[in-house]
Design a protein with these regions (language model features):
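Short linear capping/connector segments at secondary-structure termini
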Residues: 34-40, 138-141, 184
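Conserved C-terminal portion of the radical SAM core fold
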Residues: 94, 117-178
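Active-site mouth loops of central-metabolism enzymes
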Residues: 7-9, 70-77, 142-149
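C-terminal accessory regions of radical SAM enzymes
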Residues: 179-190
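Conserved SAM/AdoMet-binding glycine-rich loop
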Residues: 22-132
């Protein structure tokens, strides 16, 4: 990646919330009811930190109903059922999960850290906790000649779950990526 990951301090988050409250009041004059945490996948943060962020959001925006953000399947797996339920109660809802595919062959090759069964299990846990979610599907990730197989595997998994929506993005291969090297070596075809 062209940047390194770092967590924002709670002081920075509070400063952002103060500024957002000031601007929202000036621009809209309406109560803000939804926010979306940005910057990679904030759901990777520990439960306690997510709860503190929710508390701060509700302090500055008392009418806040939902808090969304990007998440990975592995982030969900790191949280207990009780924590997921508490996060739901704190307003977390409408996560955007980059599942990319439910094609196990592609998931293994891309070293995503999860398989189709994990998508089913972890999103089922979100369903039980009352946390809604949407998916990003990545066309092309299954490789040359495997697009239909990847789409069918993904549809089979997605149809067992309850995503609010499924968005499709195209695979982009960067020259400094591991996938680009695999293509150069002849191990994967676009």
């Amino acid at each position: 990646l062209p940047f390194s990951f770092r967590m924002s301090s709670l002081e920075d988050i509070e400063g952002d919330l103060k500024e957002a409250r000031k601007r929202c009041r000036k621009l809209t004059g309406r109560e803000v009811t939804r926010t979306f945490l940005t910057g990679a996948n904030p759901f990777v943060l520990k439960y306690e930190r997510l709860m503190k962020i929710s508390e701060m959001i509700h302090e500055y925006f008392p009418g806040m109903k939902t808090i969304g953000g990007f998440a990975r399947i592995t982030d969900i797996a790191m949280k207990s059922d009780e924590e997921l339920s508490a996060l739901s109660g704190a307003g977390y809802d409408g996560l955007t999960i980059g599942v990319e595919t439910a094609d196990d062959e592609a998931l293994k090759f891309m070293d995503k850290g999860y398989l189709a069964a994990d998508i089913l299990k972890q999103c089922g846990r979100l369903d039980k906790a009352g946390i809604g979610y949407s998916f990003f599907y990545l066309t092309g990730i299954s490789g040359a000649g495997r697009g239909e197989a990847g789409a069918r595997a993904s549809a089979a998994v997605f149809n067992q779950l309850h995503p609010a929506r499924v968005g499709a993005n195209m695979l982009t291969i960067y020259p400094d990526s591991g996938l680009y090297e695999e293509i150069r070596r002849g191990n994967w075809r676009e």
